[in-house]
From Swiss-Prot:
This is Olfactory receptor 1500. It comes from the Eukaryota. It is found in: Cell membrane. Disulfide bonds join C97-C189. GO terms for cellular component: plasma membrane. Pfam families: 7tm_4. SUPFAM superfamilies: Family A G protein-coupled receptor-like. The lineage of its organism: Eukaryota, Metazoa, Chordata, Craniata, Vertebrata. The gene is Olr1500. The chain crosses the membrane at residues 26-49, 58-79, 101-120, 140-158, 197-219, 237-260, 273-292. Residues 1-25, 80-100, 159-196, 261-272 are extracellular. Belongs to the G-protein coupled receptor 1 family.
Length: 312
């Protein structure tokens, strides 16, 4: 349907990844293996935290929510990517595109918020150990997680509604493997000033401020451990915080890389590669980082396996 030189767009074409045809099958198998690893790894953490009573602590409540967020974050984009890699016409409906955008932002925002909360949890545990159980009570932590989900849903809904009000002309080709908000803005023939303004303002609240809060938490932790009497205590703190710092580096490093690295003619390829890092690679590595460097997780896995063997 046309009018005023505009076309009602019913679907978009996702060009996906610039993969040569001879490597298409290889990359399909690679992405499928990565997605299955994401599902199994993050489900394992969720199940362990649920089944093992020794992990019923704030730190692991946040970790299980992070694993759930990682699992859903990848599931928003990966199934459609795999489907389109096997399709002659890699399309997504207009409604499906907005739905994908909404949930992508929900789970992406949630990961950013949870990393802040986990940093705060470590800060309280190390700097105020005697008051830890009082400050990080079960009720407080559950309420905090619920609040974070509400904030992320509200933020994602705002951007989705702002995109929904835009008009899209004849161009419907998205140079990405999912409905990225920046790619959609490039296709719009409407005034996108409000959209860009909200991205800059709220982007700082969702990305910059959480990152600064994490840095502040670890600065306080660093100065606190300088007062520790023994090397063993310092090593224990570093081993406890090391997993979280690794995840923070992976997540924020790739996101900042999109905006801080100089853009050239291959800026679209760079954005796609970076997006693949924080939507696929990071969620895949997180379970390994937390399980391989965490004694509690290893012991919980052994206890659950032994319990199942005894019950059989």
């Amino acid at each position: 349907m046309t009018g005023n030189n505009q076309t009602l767009i019913l679907e978009f074409l996702l060009l996906g990844l610039p993969i040569p045809s001879e490597y298409h099958l290889l990359f399909y198998a690679l992405f499928l293996a990565m997605y299955l690893t994401i599902i199994l790894g993050n489900l394992l953490i969720i199940v362990l935290v649920r089944l093992d009573s020794h992990l019923h602590m704030p730190m692991y409540l946040f970790l299980s929510n992070l694993s759930f967020s990682d699992l859903c974050f990848s599931s928003v984009t990966m199934p459609k990517l795999l489907q389109n890699m096997q399709s002659q016409v890699p399309s997504i409906s207009y409604t499906g595109c907005l739905t994908q955008l909404y949930f992508f932002m929900v789970f992406g925002d949630m990961e950013s918020f949870l990393l802040v909360v986990m940093a705060y949890d470590r800060y309280v545990a190390i700097c105020f150990p005697l008051r830890y159980t009082t400050i990080m009570s079960t009720k407080f932590c559950a309420s905090l997680v619920l609040l974070l989900w509400m904030l992320t849903m509200t933020h994602a809904l705002l951007h989705t509604l702002l995109i929904a009000r835009l008009s899209f002309c004849e161009k419907n080709v998205i140079l990405h493997f999912f409905c990225d908000i920046s790619a959609l803005l490039k296709l719009s023939c409407s005034d996108i000033y409000v959209n860009e303004l909200m991205i800059y303002i709220l982007g700082g609240l969702i990305i910059i401020i959480p990152f600064l809060l994490i840095v502040m938490s670890y600065v306080r932790i660093f100065f606190s451990i300088l007062k520790f009497p023994s090397i063993q205590d310092i090593y224990k703190v570093f081993s406890t915080c090391g997993s979280h710092l690794s995840v923070v580096t992976l997540f924020y490093g790739t996101i900042f890389g999109i905006y801080l690295c100089p853009s050239g003619n291959n800026s679209t390829v760079k954005e796609i590669a970076m997006a693949m890092m924080y939507t696929v690679v990071t969620p895949m590595l997180n379970p390994f980082i937390y399980s391989l460097r965490n004694r509690d997780m290893k012991r919980a896995l052994i206890r659950v396996i032994c319990t199942k063997k005894i019950s059989l």
